[in-house]
From Swiss-Prot:
GO terms for cellular component: cytosol. Its EC number is 3.5.4.19, 3.6.1.31, 1.1.1.23. Transmembrane segments: none annotated. Binds 1 zinc ion. The active site is at E687, H688. This is Histidine biosynthesis trifunctional protein. Pathway: Amino-acid biosynthesis; L-histidine biosynthesis; L-histidine from 5-phospho-alpha-D-ribose 1-diphosphate: step 2/9; Amino-acid biosynthesis; L-histidine biosynthesis; L-histidine from 5-phospho-alpha-D-ribose 1-diphosphate: step 3/9; Amino-acid biosynthesis; L-histidine biosynthesis; L-histidine from 5-phospho-alpha-D-ribose 1-diphosphate: step 9/9.
């Protein structure tokens, strides 16, 4: 509720001299008989007063003027009794809502739009007569209390209506708060008036005072200064606020002041063109987003860059909120159609594009062009973590109930249990054809052969000195969780690429996780078939970060695993990164992941159709896939053949729209030699490297960084993805510099052992004691010294 006093402004100069305390009321009445149209609009637009009313004299303002007032910040119209006849005109002709019209009756203005439902004439006070003392008197007279100490309960909120704390006020503290324009309260512990921030420095600028509906509690709206309201140095006495738009605005304001010169945020602040481009990019991604999680994610991205533009231009969220409030009050509204250029663009997108699907061409000597071609999309890790962390923590703390809630929320399926235990019911194999079984069996067997060959044949033993035998032997990781992307996609290949090596390594417990289908709550029969073949204990019917958390921490029905493996979207990757760094989880992962990618090296003799097919097999994964062709001494004719083949084949693919967008940011890099091409590939470190060059096998020795290499014209990436035997779970985003693809050793750990005889101790003991002494670790030294002394290998008085 606002206070039952309404300052009447008949000239703007008087407002300017008394604004500091008059604005605390939170409402004003503009005198339409004294102010002209421009003055009314100027005040309504520029002054930050929550409620602006206008006394409307008959016939002074035109209909257009009245609509302009109501559409630009004037909340309601006060009509004197003698002018009441214009009310019908306002409602019926101008479409003004009745609750925005206040009509006088017997000296009282009855109103349903402002919070107070009526104002008597004596409560409407000319701004020229309004003093601090009068305002204090009105406030104190309005509020009441039944407390024995006479104090008034006071809720303190910030300008965004977020609660900072609950305090108490006395008549004297209210008077002082209005006098100083600061947050002033009554301290019950000290039994005295409390000027907030007087000792702590965490003061408050008082913006508005109001009462509740019964006038037995006050609300102070303040602008909090420095670290916060609470003595514990949090913004609120109820803890820190959640990260939201207000928190992001605060963070960006801070970064505007102290962001490092080379940071990405500083680049955004200093480069308006880059910032505008990111806003357009994120807006486009939001229009293309599907599903609740993706739409909310893309919207958050757009909000980030939009807020960066606001902060850069000294525009606050409060300014935006005021604008929204003003728009909410509009009487006449435009139809809401998009601007013509965007309508035209939308129509153009609805029509099938007819332009050629071609890659960009850049020469290796063009350093900037190469840098752009080899750059990968920026991954907003910290922003993703803000979304993922609460999901992980909720599943960790609440187990199955949280997991089921997220499955219903994100996958649209309400399940009674989050797991499908082995042996798997026959109904889950329905729809699985014999042809598919044969294809999966062949793939499983080939992957098994290749990964079984990787098992060490015997324990590694090395005698480093006579009597010193060192050994290393593998042991399987006991429990592994294998994430299989699913939902609308069917990816049995990922299931077998992870499940078979786990079985070969003899992991004791294999757990699959895959999001259920929205249609029936099941996973695809192909995935269930692979799970049965590799001896999986169960399939967790969940996806995303929640599935990773369930396996990493365990729930009532899901065992805690020791390692989580498998590809996924950015949320899955973020969850894997989180759990591997949490000592409470004690869970490792296979590798980080990014968008899928391929780099093809081709020379003049390469088959253009083969090259195009390899590029397109990667491009159809998604618009963010990375597709690069490095050409060695390619002629203009060969380049055109490849471009034509890309276009012709792409137009035959069901996912041509995705391919078109991917190829639009893909590149052909022209090199002069094989070594230069391999050097460029090593720098990029692709997930998939395809060598369509003469004598391809001779150049494999030059490959330093790649997830997997496909050698020769008849080795498409597709074979490695499904059936050749190598693993398709590979490092992306340049991580091939540090990580291997999934292999048998991925599912093992290696333990070392040493067996030292007295002869061996004699050979290395003095060296051990020497180094231990230098490091100041006498216990280490003594463990050797005691043994050697008892063996008579050193004198008893040896120091």
């Amino acid at each position: 509720m606002v206070l039952p006093i309404l300052p009447l402004i008949d000239d703007l100069a008087s407002w300017g001299t008394k604004k500091a305390y008059a604005s605390l009321v939170g409402q004003v009445l503009l005198d339409g008989s004294s102010l002209n149209k421009d003055e009314v609009l100027q005040f309504a637009k520029e002054e930050e007063v929550p409620l602006v009313a206008l006394s409307l004299p008959n016939a002074k303002f035109s209909d257009d003027d009245i609509i302009a007032f109501l559409n630009n910040g004037v909340s309601s119209l006060f009509i004197a009794s003698q002018d009441a006849k214009i009310v019908d005109h306002l409602v019926e002709e101008l479409n003004v809502p009745k609750n925005r019209i206040v009509v006088e009756g017997n000296g009282v203005f009855h109103n349903q739009f402002l919070v107070n439902q009526k104002f008597s004439q004596d409560r409407i006070v000319s701004i020229k007569k309004l003093t601090k003392d009068l305002l204090i008197k009105e406030v104190v007279a309005e509020v009441r209390t039944d407390r024995p100490d006479g104090l008034f309960t006071t809720l303190v909120v910030d300008q965004y209506e977020r609660c900072l704390g609950l305090v108490y006020s006395s008549k004297e503290s209210i008077a002082k708060a209005i006098d100083l324009g600061r947050g002033v309260y009554y301290s019950r512990s000290r039994n005295e008036i409390w000027v907030k921030g007087e000792t702590s420095g965490n003061g408050q600028k008082l913006l508005q005072i109001s009462t509740d509906c019964d006038s037995d509690a006050l609300k102070f709206i303040v602008e909090q200064e420095n670290v916060g309201f609470c003595h514990l140095e949090t913004m609120s006495c109820f803890g820190e606020f959640k990260h939201g738009l207000v928190g992001l605005e605060s963070l960006l304001k801070q970064r505007l002041q102290d962001a490092p010169k080379e940071s990405y945020t500083r680049r955004l602040f200093n480069d308006p063109a880059l910032l505008d481009a990111k806003i357009k990019e994120e807006a486009e991604e939001l229009t293309e987003a599907k599903g609740k999680q993706e739409i909310s994610w893309e919207a958050a991205d757009l909000f980030y860059f939009a807020l960066a533009k606001l902060v850069t231009n000294n525009v606050s969220l409060k300014d935006v909120e005021n604008n929204l409030n003003m728009k909410h009050l509009k009487i006449t509204r435009r139809k809401g159609d998009a601007k013509p250029k965007f309508v035209a663009q939308a129509k153009a997108e609805e029509e099938a594009p007819t332009g050629p699907i071609h890659l960009h061409v850049v020469n290796a000597s063009d350093k900037e062009g190469i840098k752009k071609a080899l750059s990968r999309p920026i991954q907003k890790t910290s922003e993703i973590m803000h979304l993922v962390n609460p999901i992980i923590e909720n599943v960790r703390d609440r187990g199955d109930s949280a997991l089921l809630e997220y499955t219903e929320k994100f996958d649209g399926v309400k399940l009674s249990t989050p797991v499908l235990n082995a042996p798997f019911p026959e109904e889950y194999f329905e729809g699985l054809t014999e042809e598919m079984k044969d294809a999966l069996d062949l793939s499983i067997e080939n992957v098994r052969k290749f990964h079984a060959a990787q098992l060490p044949k015997e324990t590694l033993e090395v005698e480093t000195q006579p009597g010193v035998l060192c050994s290393r032997f593998p042991r399987p990781i006991e429990k592994v969780g294998l994430y299989i992307p699913g939902g609308t996609a069917i990816l049995p290949s990922t299931a077998l690429m992870l499940g078979v090596p786990a079985q070969v390594a003899q992991c004791k417990e294999i757990v699959f996780a895959s999001p259920p289908r929205k249609s029936d709550g099941k996973v695809s029969p192909e995935v269930v078939y692979v799970a049965e073949k590799v001896g999986a204990r169960m399939i967790v019917l969940a996806g995303g970060a929640q599935a990773v958390a369930a396996m990493a921490y365990g729930t009532e029905t899901i065992p805690k695993v020791d390692k989580v493996l498998g590809p996924g979207n950015q949320f899955v990757t973020a969850a894997k990164m989180y759990v591997q760094n949490d000592t409470q989880a004690l869970c490792s992962i296979d590798m980080p992941a990014g968008p899928s990618e391929v780099l093809v090296i081709a020379d003049e003799d390469a088959d253009a159709d083969f090259v195009a097919s390899d590029l397109l097999s990667q491009a159809e994964h998604g618009i963010d896939s990375q597709v690069i062709l490095v050409g060695i001494k390619l002629s203009e004719k060969k380049i055109q053949e490849i471009q034509d083949a890309v276009h012709d084949q792409a137009m035959q693919l069901p996912r041509v729209d995705i391919v078109r967008k991917c190829i639009a940011h893909s590149t052909i890099i022209l090199c002069d030699g094989y070594e230069e091409a391999l050097e460029m590939s090593n720098k990029y470190a692709p997930e998939h490297l395809i060598l369509q060059i003469a004598n391809a096998n001779d150049y494999v020795k030059l490959v330093d960084n790649a997830g997997s290499v496909f050698v020769g014209a008849y080795t498409p990436e597709s074979c490695g993805d499904y059936s050749s035997g190598t693993n398709h779970t590979l490092p992306t985003y340049g991580y091939a510099r540090q990580y291997s693809g999934a292999n048998t050793a991925t599912f093992q750990k290696f333990i070392t052992a040493q067996n030292i005889t007295p002869e061996g101790l004699e050979n290395i003991g003095r060296a051990v004691m020497c180094v231990a002494k230098k490091e100041g670790l006498d216990g280490h030294r003594n463990a050797v010294k005691i043994r050697m002394s008892k063996l008579g290998l050193i004198p008893k008085d040896f120091q």
